[in-house]
Amino acid sequence: MKRNTMHKISAISIDSPDMRSAGRDVLSLALMDARNHTLQLLGEYEKALAEVNFEVPCVPELNPPLWELGHVGWFAEWWLSRNLQRHLGRHADPAATRLASIEAGVDEWFNSSLVPHDSRWTLELPGVDELKGYLLDTLEANLELLEKTPDDDDALYFYRLALFHEDMHGEAWVYMAQTLGLPLQVAMPGPLSSSVPLLVPATRWSLGLPDAAGFTFDNERPSQMVAVPEFEIDTQPVCWSQFVEFVDDGGYDREELWHAQGWRWLQAKNAEDGRRGPAYVEQIGVARFGGAAAVLQTRFGRSLRMLGGQPVMHVSWWEANAWCRWAGRRLPAEVEW
């Protein structure tokens, strides 16, 4: 979901992968932009959930909204203003003693390594206004430190980490809204152009990122050369008109199309909610007149009719794999993707 504030700063866009190498000045603006984005999303939750004290169901894919909010501020403070080894970047000792927080109790509330998921629903958290104040104060402290920070990868590592962490939780706010049926203004993907098979010749490919790439997560290192055999891949994602044919051909009733574990998953979903199609789909099939795809899917609390040329959304790996078996295809490996 695109942010609504500044889009281009200096030579690097704050929505660009080049943010991995962003310098101090760009990072400062990007951190403010990410926080504005968090608060904008929070505002939508306040409209929908403030009267019920932001209560949401305790399910594995969600966090309580107030916990989500406080955790973002806690994470940045923990790794930046409270971290005396922040200048060492990824060479810092993650277990090193931290300075005290400006807010008592935050480690017991918001440290995701120590607070089990389900227990987050039973915490007595501060109110939304107090948490907003905590986020403001910690951001200001972190930005003051950033002004005095050298422009090198080690010194900027945790500032970039805090930025990407907050962006990741921005995604969590969005998918939580979809799960709960809360209204958000998120652009729909348009119809795809025609898909054709693309033959990719055999090659060797560098998978992962080198240290010189700027910021990298630990699971992106080290880079390694891998042999990639020749393969064929479609140039566009699977669209609804293709997936509807799979459903119409009994794809959700034919065990032979499913991985054994996927079939067990499907039966559990069917017992739970009568699942016979992708998540959030209310109707799916071939239209009686014209033979076009007919898909009605809930998007952020609204029932919308999907166009046949739009990409399929909200399918699990099991469903995607079953479609591939039906279509005589397979899912791409990471290096192929």
Locations of regions flagged by a protein language model:
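Acidic, carboxylate-rich catalytic segments that either coordinate divalent cations
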Residues: 8-15
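Extended beta-strand/loop cores of jelly-roll/beta-sandwich
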Residues: 2, 19-34, 39-45, 56-335
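Amphipathic, low-complexity, repeat-rich surface-exposed segments
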Residues: 51-52
